[in-house]
């Protein structure tokens, strides 16, 4: 039987596990090679067919995997190995025998470099700890750390070692690659302390290390540069601007092909329709606007505009200071009282932005002794707040079953515990199961923070958000949000117990050391809350629009995941097809967001549609027709009835 190196086997195994996790919703850590796909994991034949096709394409197999041959993940792995290496039997990885010194040397180097990229003390990094779920080190940091390891060890290969779960697994893969490229003797010398400048962190190795050069890419006539935005994160190069130069070439190519259209400027108020300057075509065009988060249409309400104008005349343009020095205005205090009352809490603190609210709150209340449990698809401001705090992040899969397993695993942790979740998930549109989450928090002694950025003004009888939606108003420890969406202003806030809010005012750096929102903005948000509560018909109209449009899209066969809010995703998956889909939609006069990495994971690309109360039934019908026609143009699946509708409309035209 042919031998397969540890590196080859481990890399393939982790890639296969990652693909199964991505397409089934499991965490990689929850998947066993020997679990029966249908009986143990509930993977049906339809899902398995998608996985088999994805793996066959991923590994460019001449003979595709057949679902009848796959009962376990190991069956799929063995099938790939047999096709890749023409093996006649199933294989196990060949072990690499290293001396204790060499193994210790490489393990210490891996820990040292990962410590520098993650903020951990090197002594806190256990080799057998799960990189993501135990240590909370994200994929961007992993890629950056691996890049430094490749440069430090002067490895020829530029291929990132895919998805090793632990530092120990990564160490094994590096060992195999080192033995292959440099030989066993070189490796053993390192372990005996006979290191060269390539692994001397105190030496200046810039002149000796040849930076990796960009691998030539085949430019496809349609997609152009085949890279994704993920490929420009953590590029190792002596010039820190190198990644920017590379990205510029990539971005200009995408703009030229009208695939990227980020930052198109508005030339009129943003309502159900808006005029924008289309930089790709050089035209001033009116679009159906489905990219606005002004869910209740308050951003153009005359009463709110007048409130902003009056406050500017009375208090000036801005306060030019932070709140605890000379930046507080009576309107800030009034706004905090209104927000606290809306949420049913004692007090409220207003931050310069929703992003800074998450950063400031999480970093002030947690430290390295504490655990923060965060949903894998939480907003980036939550993830960054966890990093800034230095607390141990425990990322759970987008499932409360996954959260429960993680809480149970760390039930005896002596430090504090905080569960952080979006109320409405910003790129997916689904709503957290708050009652179940609160029961888990109570059982395991954890506090809860809910980010209501896309819930306030959308969920609940009065628009108060997630807790009101579940009749749990005032029961969540911390309710956080932004005023830049339904409330049509700017800034973020946290509502909670009075003593907790008081603590945040003095220990939340993004509040203490930052200028606050201008008084006119505060006046506008105060007016927005008043109008929202006084005109409940806006919320009723919003939900009428959501139900109508969502039903039409579902009947057409679009994949909307579990959306149940004003955010409706149309999930495509493939980046290139999603970019073409977005281009076709925009060409027909509809503006919505085309979301690829880093907004979502690579392979989870989508269009993101935002519904507002300002949309008319005619707007929704026209948008539906545009989406169906565009989907048919680029090959996004729709069902037969939608296809017939499109043919009929074309015939009438």
Curated annotation (Swiss-Prot):
Highest taxon of the lineage? Bacteria
Q: Which GO terms describe its cellular component?
A: membrane
Its record classes its membrane topology as:
Single-pass membrane protein
Q: Which residues bind pyridoxal 5'-phosphate?
A: 354-355, 426, 454, 482
Protein keywords: Aminotransferase, Antibiotic biosynthesis, Membrane, Phosphopantetheine, Phosphoprotein, Pyridoxal phosphate, Transferase, Transmembrane, Transmembrane helix
This entry's Gene Ontology molecular function terms read:
pyridoxal binding; pyridoxal phosphate binding; transaminase activity
N6-(pyridoxal phosphate)lysine PTM positions:
485
Top enzyme class: transferase
Binding, substrate:
379
Query: What are the names of the required cofactors?
Result: pyridoxal 5'-phosphate
Per UniProt, residues of the Carrier domain are 7-84
Q: What is its EC number?
A: 2.3.2.-
Q: In which pathway does it act?
A: Antibiotic biosynthesis; prodigiosin biosynthesis
Q: Name one Pfam family in it.
A: PP-binding
> Transferase as a keyword?
yes
Q: Where in the cell is it found?
A: Membrane
Instruction: Give the sites modified to O-(pantetheine 4'-phosphoryl)serine.
Output: 45
State what the entry records as the consequence of deleting this gene: Cells with an insertion in the ACP domain of this gene show an white phenotype and produce 2-methyl-3-n-amyl-pyrrole (MAP) but not prodigiosin. Cells with an insertion in the aminotransferase domain of this gene show a light pink phenotype and produce less prodigiosin than the wild-type.
Output one GO BP term.
antibiotic biosynthetic process
TM region positions? 512-532
Query: Key word Glycoprotein present in the record?
Result: no
PANTHER family documented for this protein? CLASS II AMINOTRANSFERASE/8-AMINO-7-OXONONANOATE SYNTHASE, LD36009P
Relate the protein's function as given in its record: Involved in the biosynthesis of 4-methoxy-2,2'-bipyrrole-5-carbaldehyde (MBC), one of the terminal products involved in the biosynthesis of the red antibiotic prodigiosin (Pig). Carrier of the L-malonyl group (malonyl-S-PigH), which is decarboxylated by PigJ to yield a C2 carbanion acetyl-S-PigH. Then the pyrrolyl group of pyrrolyl-S-cysteinyl PigJ intermediate is captured by the C2 carbanion acetyl-S-PigH to yield the pyrrolyl-beta-ketoacyl-S-PigH.
The protein depicted here goes by the name 4-hydroxy-2,2'-bipyrrole-5-methanol synthase PigH
User: Lineage from the top down?
Assistant: Bacteria, Pseudomonadati, Pseudomonadota, Gammaproteobacteria, Enterobacterales
């Amino acid at each position: 039987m042919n031998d397969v190196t540890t590196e080859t086997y481990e890399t393939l195994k982790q890639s296969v596990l990652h693909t199964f996790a991505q397409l089934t919703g499991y965490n990689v850590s929850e998947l066993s090679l020997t679990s029966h796909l249908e009986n143990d994991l509930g993977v049906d034949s339809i899902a398995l067919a998608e996985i088999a096709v994805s793996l066959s394409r991923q590994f460019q197999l001449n003979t595709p995997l057949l679902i009848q041959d796959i009962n376990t993940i190991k069956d799929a792995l063995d099938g790939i190995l047999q096709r890749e290496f023409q093996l006649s039997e199933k294989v196990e990885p060949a072990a690499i025998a290293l001396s204790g010194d060499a193994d210790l040397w490489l393990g210490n180097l891996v820990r040292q470099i990962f410590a520098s990229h993650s903020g951990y003390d090197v002594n806190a990094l256990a080799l057998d700890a799960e990189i993501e779920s135990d240590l909370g080190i994200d994929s961007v940091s992993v890629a950056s750390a691996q890049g430094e390891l490749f440069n430090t060890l002067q490895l020829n290969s530029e291929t990132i070692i895919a998805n090793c779960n632990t530092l120990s697994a990564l160490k094994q893969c590096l060992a195999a690659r080192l033995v292959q490229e440099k030989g066993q003797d070189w490796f053993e010398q390192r372990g005996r302390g006979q290191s060269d400048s390539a692994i001397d962190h105190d030496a200046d190795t810039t002149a000796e290390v040849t930076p990796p050069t960009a691998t030539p890419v085949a430019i496809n006539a349609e997609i152009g540069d085949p890279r994704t935005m993920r490929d420009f994160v953590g590029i190792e190069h002596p010039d820190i601007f190198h990644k920017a130069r590379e990205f510029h070439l990539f971005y200009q190519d995408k703009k030229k092909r009208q695939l990227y259209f980020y930052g198109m400027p508005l030339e009129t108020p943003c309502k159900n329709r808006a005029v924008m300057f289309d930089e790709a075509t050089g035209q001033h065009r009116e679009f159906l606007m489905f990219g606005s988060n002004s869910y209740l249409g308050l951003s153009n309400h005359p009463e709110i505009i007048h409130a902003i104008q009056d406050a500017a005349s009375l208090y000036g343009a801005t306060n030019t200071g932070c709140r605890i020095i000379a930046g507080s205005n009576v309107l800030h205090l009034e706004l905090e009282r209104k927000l606290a009352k809306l949420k049913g809490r004692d007090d409220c603190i207003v931050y310069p932005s929703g992003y800074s609210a998450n950063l400031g709150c999480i970093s002030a209340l947690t430290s390295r002794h504490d655990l923060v449990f965060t949903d894998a698809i939480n907003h980036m401001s939550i993830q960054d707040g966890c990093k800034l705090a230095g607390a141990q992040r425990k990322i759970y899969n987008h499932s409360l079953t996954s959260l429960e397993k993680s809480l149970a695993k760390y039930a005896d942790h002596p430090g504090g515990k905080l569960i952080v979740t979006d109320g409405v998930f910003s790129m997916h549109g689904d709503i957290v199961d708050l009652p179940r989450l609160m029961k888990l928090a109570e059982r395991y002694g954890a506090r809860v923070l809910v980010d209501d950025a896309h819930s306030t003004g959308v969920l609940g009888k009065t628009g108060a958000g997630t807790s009101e939606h579940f009749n749990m108003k005032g029961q969540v420890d911390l309710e956080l949000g932004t005023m830049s969406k339904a409330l049509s202003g700017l800034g973020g806030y946290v509502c909670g117990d009075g003593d907790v809010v008081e603590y945040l005012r003095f220990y939340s750096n993004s509040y203490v050391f930052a200028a606050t929102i201008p008084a006119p903005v505060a006046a506008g948000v105060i007016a927005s809350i008043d109008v929202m509560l006084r005109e409940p018909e806006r919320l009723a109209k919003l939900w009428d629009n959501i139900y109508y449009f969502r039903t039409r899209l579902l009947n057409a066969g679009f994949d909307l995941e579990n959306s149940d809010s004003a955010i409706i995703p149309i999930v495509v998956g493939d980046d290139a097809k999603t970019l073409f889909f977005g281009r076709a939609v925009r060409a027909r006069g509809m503006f919505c967001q085309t979301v690829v990495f880093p907004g979502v994971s690579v392979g989870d690309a989508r269009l993101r549609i935002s519904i507002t109360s300002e949309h008319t039934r005619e707007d929704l019908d026209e948008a539906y027709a545009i989406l169906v026609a565009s989907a048919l143009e680029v090959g996004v699946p729709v069902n037969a009835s939608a296809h017939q509708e499109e043919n009929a409309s074309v015939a009438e035209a």
